[in-house]
């Protein structure tokens, strides 16, 4: 198989990270560590112009994410503009700040889909992880309200060593809430999750037990039909081959940060690569011609063993961001891959997961005070 320049199709999926503001303090958040340094946010008009350009290029799905997107008072206006342009719209939220009135406003504006996240299946653990004693009951109330309005009930639980052992109770909660889709997503170690990896990475035994529980529920639900879909996402750290991150670098996905930086994946801003701003270039130029979006497209950039690997068209060399975090060089093969000369870093992380005694109170939580430790501002 020869190296080649990729055929560049338009971005089908646009993620609008509206703000880094958030009322919760989850220690596994994927936001950048120095988010407190990023105080500027695109205006309503600037976001709508981004949507217009993306739709003109062929984008069809628009996700509203953050921080917590509900803190943006112009969210109904942004939803309505996206709907008028023809996007399928998705709100990814903690549910904190949501009300039945807001839900109705979003429905009237044309919002298609809402995903609510939980930290755990019980109030005590949820509060410990979110940094909010009131969060759990608010999430329960809003999940029921979402269902009552006729939206698909989509719940997300981020799993890690402190809550994965209650996965049966998590699934039971989803059944109780009459969820249509449930994402049981084991922590992916970027942003704050990478910072807290030693205290969050489950053991292999925990993962295996959780997989067994999920399979048992799938078999049961195949009979009674209580859940349409139960998705269990395992961590990269227990795989021997890397995932094809975002379907390939600059292949189908574009993220725009609160201040307007365009990225080919959520975590790319940490790389020593200059990424363009939507305030300086239009999206067509950014997608097709910018250095940042072309840096890891195709496979000509790949080192060995990726360059000669028959799986390179499947995994695209893995995650450049993960390679950078674990080796200091994004050009290296993703250490998750057993063929990588840096795979030992993954093996060491697995071993550390077996030894660690770190409790929840020893994690570094995602908040303004901790974020300021990572920049001089």
Curated annotation (Swiss-Prot):
Cofactor: [4Fe-4S] cluster
Oligomer status and interactors: Interacts with PqqD. The interaction is necessary for activity of PqqE.
Keywords tagged on the record: 4Fe-4S, Iron, Iron-sulfur, Metal-binding, Oxidoreductase, PQQ biosynthesis, S-adenosyl-L-methionine
InterPro entries in the cross-refs: 4Fe4S-binding_SPASM_dom, Aldolase_TIM, Elp3/MiaA/NifB-like_rSAM, MoaA_NifB_PqqE_Fe-S-bd_CS, PQQ_synth_PqqE_bac, PqqE-like, Radical_SAM_PqqE_MftC-like, rSAM
Protein name stated in the entry: PqqA peptide cyclase
The keyword Iron-sulfur belongs to this UniProt entry's keyword annotation: yes
Functional note: Catalyzes the cross-linking of a glutamate residue and a tyrosine residue in the PqqA protein as part of the biosynthesis of pyrroloquinoline quinone (PQQ).
Binding-site residues, [4Fe-4S] cluster: 22, 26, 29
UniProt GO BP: pyrroloquinoline quinone biosynthetic process
Family of the protein in this entry: Belongs to the radical SAM superfamily. PqqE family.
Cofactor notes: Binds 1 [4Fe-4S] cluster. The cluster is coordinated with 3 cysteines and an exchangeable S-adenosyl-L-methionine.
Gene: pqqE
Pathway, per record: Cofactor biosynthesis; pyrroloquinoline quinone biosynthesis
Keyword match Chaperone: no
Taxonomic superkingdom: Bacteria
One Pfam entry name: SPASM
């Amino acid at each position: 198989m020869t190296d080649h320049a990729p055929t560049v199709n338009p971005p089908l999926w646009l993620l609008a990270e509206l703000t880094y503001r958030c009322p919760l303090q989850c220690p596994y958040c994927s936001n950048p560590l120095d988010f407190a340094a990023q105080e500027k946010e695109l205006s309503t008009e600037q976001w709508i112009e981004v949507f217009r350009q993306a739709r003109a290029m062929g984008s069809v799905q628009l996700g509203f994410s953050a921080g917590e997107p509900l803190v943006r008072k112009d969210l109904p206006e942004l939803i309505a503009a996206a709907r008028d342009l023809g996007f399928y719209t998705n709100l990814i939220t903690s549910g904190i700040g949501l009300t039945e009135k807001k839900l109705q406003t979003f429905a009237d504006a044309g919002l298609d889909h809402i995903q609510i996240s939980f930290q755990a299946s019980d109030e005590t653990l949820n509060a410990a992880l979110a940094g909010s004693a009131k969060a759990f009951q608010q999430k329960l109330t809003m999940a029921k309200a979402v269902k009552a309005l006729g939206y698909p009930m989509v719940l997300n639980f981020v799993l890690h060593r402190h809550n994965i052992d209650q996965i049966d109770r998590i699934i039971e909660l989803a059944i109780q809430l009459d969820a249509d889709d449930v994402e049981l997503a084991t922590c992916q170690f970027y942003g704050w999750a990478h910072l807290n990896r030693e205290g969050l990475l489950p053991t292999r035994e925990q993962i295996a037990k959780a997989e067994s529980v999920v399979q048992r529920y799938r078999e049961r639900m195949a009979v009674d039909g209580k859940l349409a879909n139960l998705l269990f996402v395992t961590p990269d750290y227990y795989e021997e081959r890397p995932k094809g991150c975002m379907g390939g670098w600059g292949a189908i996905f574009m993220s725009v940060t609160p201040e307007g930086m365009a990225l080919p994946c959520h975590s790319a801003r940490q790389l020593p690569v200059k990424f363009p701003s939507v305030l300086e270039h239009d999206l067509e130029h950014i997608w097709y011609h910018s250095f940042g979006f072309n840096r890891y497209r195709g496979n000509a950039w790949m080192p060995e063993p990726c360059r000669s690997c028959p799986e390179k068209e499947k995994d695209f060399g893995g995650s450049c961001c993960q390679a950078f975090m674990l080796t200091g060089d994004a050009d290296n093969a993703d250490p998750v891959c057993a063929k990588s000369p840096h795979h030992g870093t993954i093996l060491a992380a697995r071993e550390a997961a077996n030894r660690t005694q770190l409790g929840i109170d020893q994690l570094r939580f995602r908040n303004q005070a901790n974020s300021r430790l990572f920049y001089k501002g």
